[in-house]
Amino acid sequence: MASREDELRNCVVCGDQATGYHFNALTCEGCKGFFRRTVSKSIGPTCPFAGSCEVSKTQRRHCPACRLQKCLDAGMRKDMILSAEALALRRAKQAQRRAQQTPVQLSKEQEELIRTLLGAHTRHMGTMFEQFVQFRPPAHLFIHHQPLPTLAPVLPLVTHFADINTFMVLQVIKFTKDLPVFRSLPIEDQISLLKGAAVEICHIVLNTTFCLQTQNFLCGPLRYTIEDGARVSPTVGFQVEFLELLFHFHGTLRKLQLQEPEYVLLAAMALFSPDRPGVTQRDEIDQLQEEMALTLQSYIKGQQRRPRDRFLYAKLLGLLAELRSINEAYGYQIQHIQGLSAMMPLLQEICS
């Protein structure tokens, strides 16, 4: 027979062993996670049995509606659930504190992960930007205004833009397909992750070409300015507000002076985002993203950096969230530039 002390340690919702106070009630980890997930959804569950279902350790999964109601009756509060951004920031700060308290050294698995990412990056994206010159470039894009004699006739900038964007997305696809952990996922999840992250990875890698002094992208013999983005099409280009947001992002990221392993780990974190639409194996992908995040934290901690860079990981998390917003705005822009989406069906599919 359970003692009074044992009962006080049990989850007030299902009776399982409690791990502490979560959202204002003593609950187990299972009910804590259930409450956070369920409350975050826009549509709540409904009970087919008039709200009279048993909620116990063995029966708690049978009726989400009754389980949620019991959570609320037990005193769990919706207003105590952090937003995804606040939760990510809190985790970053907790990880930062742990990193400052103990010396961090990369494990063999983390070193192998970095080697794998760097190898795939070198094979498929290492010389990507130098190859832009192959794609029907307008003459004015040349830094010294001296087009090579073998160039094709000058074409509208929209044609060149469509070419290089399609090329970058194809290289990103090759990069991801070269990662064993990515190939191990169901093909449906691979597609969902690529649709969500391809543009973000393109911009993370493109940042290595951004020049802070001139505010241009220097890709081999070509340069790209904010004015080029505004006149992609003869009739309309990217909105100035969007371009200013994009160039501000690249300037902020470039100022952090990331090393190549940090760039590829940041790209991997963007790739393995479990909240992309259409993803089915969310727990597995969440674990992969956590693995990338922990490796990035360990790598940053192991570098001899300036004191002002002690919050580098938290800054990168903030930039990832900013890049997500840019990605959404980019898709909208692509659809509204005359003739652009029709010229690059692959990117149109990615942004749809």
Swiss-Prot record:
SMART domains: HOLI, ZnF_C4
GO annotation, cellular component aspect: chromatin; cytoplasm; cytoskeleton; cytosol; nucleoplasm; nucleus
Start and end residues, zinc fingers (NR C4-type): 11-31, 47-71
Post-translational modification as stated in the protein's UniProt record: Phosphorylated at Thr-38 by PKC, dephosphorylation of Thr-38 is required for nuclear translocation and activation.
Span of domain NR LBD: 109-352
Protein's UniProt keywords contain S-adenosyl-L-methionine: no
Family of this protein: Belongs to the nuclear hormone receptor family. NR1 subfamily.
Protein name (record): Nuclear receptor subfamily 1 group I member 3
Biological classification of the source: Eukaryota, Metazoa, Chordata, Craniata, Vertebrata
